[in-house]
A protein has these predicted regions:
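Bacterial N-terminal signal peptides
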Residues: 18-26
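N-terminal secretory signal peptides and thylakoid transit peptides that target proteins
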Residues: 2-19
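C-terminal segment of N-terminal export signals and the immediately downstream linker at the start
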Residues: 4-5, 25-45
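Acidic/polar surface patches and capping/hinge elements
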Residues: 36-359
């Protein structure tokens, strides 16, 4: 069954460190850069951290897009912050690049580079929000000092964005809705759950990861249907997860609603809070955001690869069909309904939990 609920605040203290471990080897530290190098990079810190600003603009662009799938959001966030990170490190190299190979620009404006990289990625990948992105870009441009530094920054930002987009072209994200999922009969097999008559993004597990090797992340599979552990967990979900549960406390209901958001936006808000509270400079912020979003994007890929490999049924199917699971310790209840609508994907593993640990 799905993993236990873990309060979001428990992860905040280890947010950045856990992400770095999850994508070990990515965006490594360049030893030859100093704080003085960064201080000399053209930019205006009085305006605030441009990386944080563009992260917020990206989140705003996603917010109205109810139809956007969270896996696509995670991919866009990762591409966005890879491009921003690489643009900044072309000006002053403090960390290794995700997509190396374009010319350095030590006299470029850091703020112009961040804005141009973010603008290029968002307009390309979230075209339905192009007006919002263009308006934000124009507002920020008028705060920058015109001249060679701004021109160079704009050029390096666009180059970083295009290099990152080119690297991710052909990563199979565009075909992740195929092939359509066809349920198979039998105990333990995932079936569509109301109100859905489809399974979402069955091919997302074939999308190219940003960092990880999927072969190192295969899981053994869910508990055996006939095991005592399975019967115990099913009974727990049946009691606490029922729409009209008498054992679920008001606090548990609020926690469930809080965690129900099926999107990288929640952890992005936490990352942004940590970045601001720690006072990270643009280079540090760009690396932190990139690592967090690399980890979540790859978590979705690895999680969906396992979901559609194991094709494990959801609790509402399992509870209704418990008489057929071969376990004398389970009890069927065809009238059982979940507290919150079940997402249209197989149960195992829980990608909500995958994202939490990844971030």
């Amino acid at each position: 069954m799905n993993s236990p609920v873990i309060p979001r605040r428990a992860f905040v203290a280890r947010l950045l460190g856990a992400s770095a471990l999850g994508v070990a080897g990515a965006l490594t530290v360049a030893e030859d850069a100093t704080a003085d190098d960064v201080a000399r990079a053209p930019g205006d810190s009085a305006r605030g951290n441009a990386v944080v600003q563009w992260n917020a603009i990206a989140a705003e662009a996603f917010a109205p897009s109810e139809g956007t799938n969270p896996m696509a959001q995670s991919r866009t966030f990762a591409i966005l912050h890879a491009a921003i990170h690489d643009a900044l490190n072309a000006i002053v190299q403090r960390y290794g690049s995700y997509t190396p190979g374009f010319a350095a620009a030590p006299q470029a404006s850091a703020d112009a580079a961040v804005a141009a990289a973010a603008h290029e990625v968002l307009v390309r990948l979230v075209p339905e929000q192009a007006a919002l992105v263009e308006a934000a870009y124009r507002r920020l441009l008028v705060t920058l000092r015109d001249g060679p530094a701004m021109t160079a920054g704009t050029a390096i930002g666009r180059a970083a964005a295009r290099a990152t987009l080119s690297r991710r072209a052909g990563d199979r994200a565009d075909s992740a809705a195929q092939p359509l999922y066809a349920p198979r009969p039998g105990p333990g097999e995932y079936q569509f759950t109301a109100p859905f008559d489809f399974a979402a993004q069955p091919g997302w597990g074939r999308v190219e990861p940003f960092i990880i090797d999927l072969r190192e992340h295969a899981l053994d599979g869910p508990q055996a249907l006939t095991s005592v552990e399975y019967a115990r967990d099913l009974a727990h979900v049946r009691d606490i997860g029922h729409a009209a549960s008498r054992t679920r406390t008001p606090e548990q209901s609020e926690i469930a609603k809080f965690w129900y958001e099926d999107s990288p936006l929640g952890w992005n808000r936490i990352a942004s809070t940590v970045v601001r509270q720690r006072g990270l400079d643009p280079w540090e912020a760009a690396r932190a955001f990139a690592l967090v979003h690399f980890a979540m994007a790859d978590g979705f890929v690895a999680g969906f690869a396992e979901k559609y490999r194991h094709r494990f049924w959801r609790p509402e199917t399992a509870i209704a069909a418990a008489a057929s699971d071969g376990n004398p310790l389970t009890e069927a209840d065809r009238a059982w309904r979940p507290f919150l609508t079940t997402p249209p994907v197989p149960d195992y593993p829980s990608t909500h939990t995958v994202l939490g640990w990844a971030a």
